């Protein structure tokens, strides 16, 4: 589903074993969020950040309306470049919980983007995952917003 390599040193200020950085290459045709979740679970990444670029054939974004607390999903089924993917990893129900946003460019160079639900890799997907191994970041349902917010 993916290949990865651990970056040997992030900076001289960080404790190498507690804070880990990985270069991750997702396999072609996998579903991005599923593969990233599998990576985080396999490598026990429960607190971290993710960034990346890649090429995909389909993406589904989710828009949340805070007024109605309803989700509206929209799928774009076309070849696109992930011009930027940014997200974080926390822990919910003892599993890695991903919160990822992405901007994707289309054939005409216009962009679509938002909160990423799923994407199908078609070409390559190259990610950098930073784990903050000694930090706990959970998730808790928040009545006011209707979202699972950070619980520290
Ligand atoms: Fe979001």
Set out the residue ranges of the language-model regions.
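N-terminal intrinsically disordered, cationic/polar leader segments
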Residues: 1-98, 103-152
């Amino acid at each position: 589903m993916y290949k990865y390599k651990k970056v040997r040193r992030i900076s001289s200020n960080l404790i190498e074993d507690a804070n880990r950085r990985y270069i991750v290459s997702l396999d072609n045709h996998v579903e991005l969020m599923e593969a990233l979740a599998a990576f985080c679970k396999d490598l026990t990444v429960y607190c971290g950040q993710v960034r990346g670029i890649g090429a995909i054939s389909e993406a589904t974004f989710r828009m949340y309306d805070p007024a109605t607390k309803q989700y509206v999903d929209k799928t774009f089924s076309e070849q696109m470049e992930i011009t930027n993917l940014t997200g974080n990893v926390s822990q919910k129900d003892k599993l890695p919980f991903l919160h990822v946003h992405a901007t994707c460019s289309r054939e005409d160079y216009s962009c679509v983007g938002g909160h990423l639900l799923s994407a199908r890799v078609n070409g390559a997907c190259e990610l950098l995952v930073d784990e903050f191994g000694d930090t706990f970041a959970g998730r808790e349902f928040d009545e006011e917003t209707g979202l699972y917010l950070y619980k520290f």
